From Swiss-Prot:
One of the Pfam families matching this protein, by short name: RnaseA
RNA-binding recorded as keyword: no
InterPro entries per record: RNaseA (IPR001427), RNaseA-like_dom_sf (IPR036816), RNaseA_AS (IPR023411), RNaseA_domain (IPR023412)
Active site residues per record: 37 (proton acceptor), 138 (proton donor)
EC number(s) on file: 3.1.27.-
Underlying gene: ANG
Gene Ontology cellular component terms for the protein in this record: angiogenin-PRI complex; basement membrane; cytoplasm; cytoplasmic stress granule; endocytic vesicle; extracellular space; nucleolus; nucleus
GO molecular function: actin binding; copper ion binding; DNA binding; endonuclease activity; heparin binding; protein homodimerization activity; RNA nuclease activity; signaling receptor binding
Keyword Zinc-finger: no
Family stated for the protein in its record: Belongs to the pancreatic ribonuclease family.
Pyrrolidone carboxylic acid modified-residue sites: 25
Regulation: Has weak tRNA ribonuclease activity by itself due to partial autoinhibition by its C-terminus, which folds into a short alpha-helix that partially occludes the substrate-binding site. In absence of stress, the ribonuclease activity is inhibited by RNH1 in the cytoplasm. In response to stress, dissociates from RNH1 in the cytoplasm and associates with cytoplasmic ribosomes with vacant A-sites: ribosomes directly activate the tRNA ribonuclease activity of ANG by refolding the C-terminal alpha-helix. In response to stress, the angiogenic activity of ANG is inhibited by RNH1 in the nucleus.
Protein name in the entry: Angiogenin
One GO-annotated biological process of the protein: rRNA transcription
Amino acid sequence: MVMGLGLFLLVFMLGLGLTPPTLAQDNSRYRDFLTKHYDATPQGRNDRYCESMMRRRGLTSPCKDINTFIHGNSRHIKAICGDENGNPYGENLRISKSPFQVTTCNLRGGSSRPPCRYRATAGFRNIVVACENDLPVHLDQSIFRP
């Protein structure tokens, strides 16, 4: 009996290691994406905005070289991962069909140690994301399309 139970537990534990990521893990990666790249209603979109947002989002220890914040509706961002607002782009990426209002924060100076100083560039861009289970999990780039 003990031998059978031990074998069952061994097989069960091995099975856990081979299962695909759970929905909770996928949602965690999506939440990380939102934390790094989403700000629905920005208060200003200047250098001070970048310095404040980068600090509040935990992207300044060390100073991140570049980060883009996407503004607007999160449903439209999620829709890039489907046909509603996205098209295939390269290998395993999707590009938005419509442009988004974005603010890109570029690190000024060469040091990656705080205090971090950023230069803001605001505009409308199509965005390229990697998706997992129909959720954006990585912002690859933003593209200006005239």
